[in-house]
Amino acid sequence: ILLAYRNIKANKGSYTAGTDKKNITDIGSQTPDDVVKRVRFIVTGSEHGYRPKPVRRKDIPKPNGKTRPLGIPCIWDRLIQQCIKQIMEPICEAKFSNNSYGFRLNRSVEHAINRTYTMLQMMNLHYVIEFDIKGFFDNVNHSKLIRQIWSLGIHDKTLIFIIKRILTAPIKMPDNTTVLPNKGTPQGGIISPLLANIVLNELDWWIASQWEENPIAISRGR
């Protein structure tokens, strides 16, 4: 929990407040023991279990004139998400494709470009396919995501219950209306990039089975 706090504090976004108007300084003003106790109480102490506070929706301008929706969880909920990420990430990393570079530790766009260039030279192939999944974060199927998490070997029912609550946290829109989501994972949530990679993991391995293991491609590689 304290490691999660330090990781969040290192990010300047931790000073951005959620719907409860609090930021990282409100956590930092408490003793380490009190922070640990508070997190444990939020997660397991209430009668109905963990209930994240409404996520603040903010529209971020894009260069093309459109906007990108950003979901800003309250700071204590961000701390809980960071704890979950630290638990799940090592398990998931062991199951992810080596050719996946998005939102992963010690991997970047530059690594992906270098890998692509190397493969083009080795295979004597000269085509790269680029595509975008429209509205990906807003359309993640919750039930399928939970099944995918389970298939990766994460079977702790309390943890899965908390993830379900995170996915269905109320969203406070810019016009002050509240939306109860039944799909998607908000861009801006600490755990959202990891959940996105879990959703796309099956696609990564399917692509590998279609092309990476293609005998013709292997022959050309030689």
Task: Please annotate each region the language model reported.
Residues I1-D33:
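Non-catalytic, polymerase-adjacent accessory regions of viral genome-replication enzymes
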Residues I1-G13, Q86-N99:
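Charged boundary/loop elements
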Residues I8, R40-K66, I75, L79-I87, ...:
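Reverse-transcriptase-like RNA-dependent polymerase core
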Residues A10-A17, C74, I129, T185, ...:
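Short conserved micro-motifs on helix faces and helix-strand junctions that flank
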Residues S14, D26-P52:
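Amphipathic alpha-helical blocks
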Residues T19, Q86, F131-I133:
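Residues immediately flanking
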Residues P54, K95-N99, R104, H111, ...:
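Conserved polymerase palm-domain catalytic core
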